[in-house]
Amino acid sequence: MNSPTHTLLALALLSKRGDRKRNWAVALGSIIPDVAIYLWAPYQRFVNGVSGEKLWRELYFAEPMQNLIAYFNSIPIYGALAILGYVMRAKTWGKLMLFFALAALTHMATDLPVHNHDAYRHFWPLSDWRFISPLSYYESEHHAGWVMVVELAIWVTSSIVLWKRFPHRWVKAVLIGLPLSLIHI
């Protein structure tokens, strides 16, 4: 699933009008599983001069990168953070940790069923097992067209929820402009 959809869904499920800190924790938690990729790919491409083909066909699947992805996509780690946050929810940091972790878990719950040959080790450090889904969010031979329909439905539904929840003009501008982030030139 595309990162903006993860963020929209997490915000639709977990944000609260008037609770800016909570909403930022949700937004950050929704993107943290992909942060390693967003930092690594431009570095490899523009600093190290690695070709796009080598980057996504070789280096992405090499053990160092797969380990980094496992660290950032670990259900046990975010589950532990959610439990700690829940236990400490009376304190501001506990509540923020809880919503950060819940947003990250929402991201992983929607990634798990749509990764085929590029499946993550979501249960690291307890296991290196990967769920190889019959579906993929980008590979047509694994029903990407149908996955895109579901993703679009999540996108539209989440956007409607957020449009109604947050009356601010800047929120509406982001919701209108966000689809542009999926256009690949």
Question: Where in this protein do the model-derived segments appear?
Answer:
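N-terminal membrane-targeting hydrophobic helices
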Residues: M1-I183
